[in-house]
């Protein structure tokens, strides 16, 4: 919810966007701005603050050019220019563009979104990811299977084989790192996973509750 950036739920520290509530604390090094012509000026001001303090931003397809608030379109065009070095009132660049500042903030605009362009841009912005999972050849997205653009399916029913993914979530609690890996497909997954940092890992079995050291690290 972009409007949440306008309040006090999020703060910016050391190039990270920090969500800190009683229930959870989450830190984000990369903010993805999907294609769209309209954005709140207050939200974009917060995004600019994130960039000014070393944050990384990836925008795709179409940069905002209009404000959700009345009479503030000029603020939008000015802020977009300051972040990306692009005039959003003109036609979007046909090639990828990037910008950077002295605080190590970086912004990349990707005009044509594909799996490869996104993977390359994210690797440039976050060269040392929290978790790295290799591309699984047998887990293609529905659009890859049907030839549709960006996962948009036309006149095709979704079968069970097209649903699900192998994903993760990382939480920290009482000084411990907790990684939950989930396979929501109906097929087994056999792959390696790379976790940033040096850890002594235990494997927690969600079905039995068994906790055992994980020597394969």
Language model features by range: what are they?
Residues 1-217:
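Carbohydrate-binding surfaces of carbohydrate-active enzymes
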């Amino acid at each position: 919810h972009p409007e949440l950036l306008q309040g006090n739920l999020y703060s910016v520290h050391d190039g990270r966007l920090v969500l800190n509530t009683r229930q959870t604390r989450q830190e984000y090094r990369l903010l993805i701005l999907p294609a769209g012509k309209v954005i709140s000026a207050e939200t974009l001001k917060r995004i600019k603050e994130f960039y000014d303090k070393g944050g990384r931003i990836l925008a795709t397809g179409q940069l905002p050019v209009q404000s959700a608030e009345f009479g503030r379109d000029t603020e939008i065009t000015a802020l977009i220019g300051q972040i990306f070095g692009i005039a959003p009132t003109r036609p979007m660049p046909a090639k990828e563009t990037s910008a950077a500042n002295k605080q190590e903030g970086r912004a990349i605009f990707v005009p044509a979104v594909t799996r490869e362009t996104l993977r390359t841009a994210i690797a440039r912005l976050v060269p040392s990811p929290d978790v790295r999972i290799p591309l699984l050849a047998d887990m293609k997205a529905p659009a890859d299977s049907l030839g549709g653009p960006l996962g948009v399916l036309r006149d095709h029913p979704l079968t069970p084989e097209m649903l699900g993914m192998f994903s993760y979530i990382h939480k920290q609690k009482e000084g411990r790192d907790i990684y939950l890996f989930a396979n929501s497909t109906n097929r087994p997954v056999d792959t390696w996973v790379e976790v940033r940092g040096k850890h002594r890992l235990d494997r927690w079995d969600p079905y039995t509750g068994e906790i055992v050291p994980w020597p394969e690290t």
